[in-house]
Amino acid sequence: GGHSVPRYVTTKIGSGAGIVSKQLDKCHELGIPIRLRTYVDRIIRTADGVEGVEVFEGYRFPKAGSGRHRSLKANKGVILCYGGFSADVPYRTIQDPKLNATLDTTNQPGATSELWRETSSIGCLQAQNDWIQCGPWGNPHEKGMGIGWQFNQTAAAEYGLWTNSAGNRFVNELANRKVRSDAIMVEQANGRKCFAIADANGVKPFETQRPGMLNKHLERNLIFKYDTLDELAKAQGIDAEQLKQTVEEFNGYVKNKKDPVLGRYINNEQLPVETAPFYVGELQPKVHHTMGGLITDDKCMVLDVKTDKPIKGLYAAGEATGHVHGAVRLGSVAILDCL
């Protein structure tokens, strides 16, 4: 989300698993052991730098202190790739009070703050931990990342439109994630739900990119299909007359290839939203990514909070690091950050 020009490619399966599976294959080929159920309890830092970690092996999430405690000495260094803390409600609420327990997260349950706190305690420089991104395309009728975001973004945001329950567009559907998430939260604060709408033409690219997913959305009641906009509006509690007027105005923008109201980029393949059936899914921002984190030098060495100098033997990459994406990460570009 948020791209103004094409700048990335994706895996055939459309997710990061297509990358991780290849990395695992390479680790097995090189004989690199993968330690599962291993909880890093402490980073061992001395006057000479970082020398290893203390862990609990056989850890049972989320039971703190479970498993067998042992120390692991590093031969050359420790690389921190512990990710973000989007699933840690207390810690993320400290950073940004509005991201409380009422918001779900796209992350797995282990995306917590223990190592964020540990690196802070051993003197690692961190910055902008309150820069936390929500994915605006989430669906409230499923837990976690789910699949509903695929229709909301790939079909409706790119080839349809987003409206509120009053029947009005309220944001540029292709704006960055912060702009869109904030706009949805404002609508919700004023008692209005937000919806992603596409027609028969709008879902065709989605069906091509992700075969079979449209039916899965329908089977799970994440989206609904209607023969007319009137039926859609009545079923979803949207002002029907205003919705039809909004769609008519939007179709004019499509034909003119210009959105003078919200400044949305009109895709050259975009067709007017007028061909039945019409599809709709509800929108709900979910906590997705943390842009702040450890500050590193150009060799990925973590800096000391007192000296701003690299800490010997300590490196970091991925979502654990900061000063990479600014206040709003663009979709997919964290792949290079991790690699």
Predicted regions: what they are:
Residues 14, 29, 60-142, 300, ...:
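Glycine-rich loop(s) and the adjacent beta-strand/alpha-helix scaffold that form part
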Residues 56, 74-75, 80-82, 165, ...:
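Short, well-ordered coil/turn residues at beta-beta hairpins
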Residues 116-238:
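An anion/pyrophosphate-binding glycine-rich loop and adjacent beta-alpha core
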Residues 242-324:
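A glycine-rich dinucleotide-binding beta-alpha-beta segment and adjacent secondary-structure elements
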Residues 9-11, 69, 106, 149-154, ...:
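Short Gly/Pro-enriched turn/cap motifs at secondary-structure boundaries
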Residues 134-139, 178-181, 285-289, 320-335:
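Glycine-rich phosphate/pyrophosphate-binding beta-alpha loops
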Residues 1, 228-249:
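Rossmann-like flavin
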